[in-house]
Amino acid sequence: MLVNVISMVLSFLENVISVYGEPISDWGTMAEKVLVTGGFGLVGSQTVRRLVDDGHRVVVTDLDTPAQRKAATSLPANAEAHWADLTDKREVDVLVAEVSPTVIVHLAAVILPAAYRHPQLARRVNVDATAALLRAAEASEHPPRFVLASSNAVYGSRNPHRHPDRLRVDSPLQPADLYGAHKVVVENLLRASSLEWVILRLGGVISVEPGAMPFTGDALFFESALPTDGRIHTVDVRDVAAAFAAATTADVAGETLLIAGDDSHLLRQKEVGLALAEARGLSDVLPAGRPGDPDSDENWFVTDWLDTARAQQALKFQHHSWPDMLAEMRAIVGWKRYPMSFVGPVVRQLLKRQAAYRDAPGRYADPWGAIRSRLGEPRPDSSD
């Protein structure tokens, strides 16, 4: 929530002060040809950069929009764009046939909270498009390794009072929302395929860049609905990119791995918001929020702490601690932290108006009820 608000404010302060991909060409001899879906998103853009830095040839695919075309002009050397709508099976078949990748890193998805407001689109992208991509990959003359982005949402609601241990790969899968259910479906599709596969279940991905995440009323409302004492295991997006890049070649075929930061990233929901606000020069701007009900297994969100030992051993991706991220955020904001104090009251009122429990009765958070009231039904439907 704070990342979005701060992004808007910093952009304002800055103002006060101050290709289409052709058919894949001859790239020469390099390690792998990696197709990255959703390659212009938060995780995708960092993953593309890391793959190129590691010496791979990268083909980035995403929807053909003006914003994506503009982003494509900044792709690094040894990366190029190939536009495709993954919900169109014919375009998927053409994409995979023309690129002929040795590895597919599948990041394209409708994530939260947009998936709640657009459930049919979310299923087409998260499930149907993934299934089409898997079929096209299996039909390739040289089937690629398939690295799938999944989520800790597959485990469902997590009451830390009743579940004190960290989540493990073999913890029961009990998705509580449609996004988690979608990820369970595509994980199973991938395991049932004939492809060499790797699944990475991600924790709470955060960027140090103020403008990295979109600013929307839905996002503010959504984040304010989460229990303030809910556990969340954050991770720097650059470390997520490092994990995906490593997974393209590491000896982890057939493994599911949990991707989150080192132990400094074992946080509570409220801690994250307060720390991000302070790093950007904003204090006392968060609405009070509500804790989760310790006697309920349902009224909690789908985040928790993860056992990342095996993933770190295999992929060696944890490079940015939580304190280091906060220090970097302060450095990026620099002198602008000081005038931020003057806009604090405006930000406070903005967040208060978007708060999920404003004027609502009750003591404890009800994330699913709040989400349902504004964004739509979050629970899995029968097709999930």
Predicted regions: what is each one?
Residues 34-54:
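N-terminal Rossmann NAD(P)H-binding glycine-rich loop of SDR-like oxidoreductase domains
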Residues 56-68:
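Conserved glycine-rich Rossmann-like NAD(P)H-binding loop of the short-chain dehydrogenase/reductase
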Residues 83-125, 156:
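NAD(P)H-binding glycine-rich loop region in Rossmannoid oxidoreductase-like domains
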Residues 87, 117, 121-132, 173, ...:
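Glycine-rich NAD(P)-binding loop of the Rossmann-fold in SDR/ketoreductase-type enzymes
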Residues 131-178:
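Conserved Rossmann-fold NAD(P)-dependent oxidoreductase catalytic core, especially the SDR/UDP-sugar
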Residues 160, 174-198:
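Active-site Tyr-X1-5-Lys
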Residues 188-234, 238-239, 273-277:
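NAD(P)-dependent short-chain dehydrogenase/reductase
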Residues 243-314, 320, 324-328, 336-345, ...:
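Mid/C-terminal beta-alpha module of Rossmann-like enzyme folds, strongest
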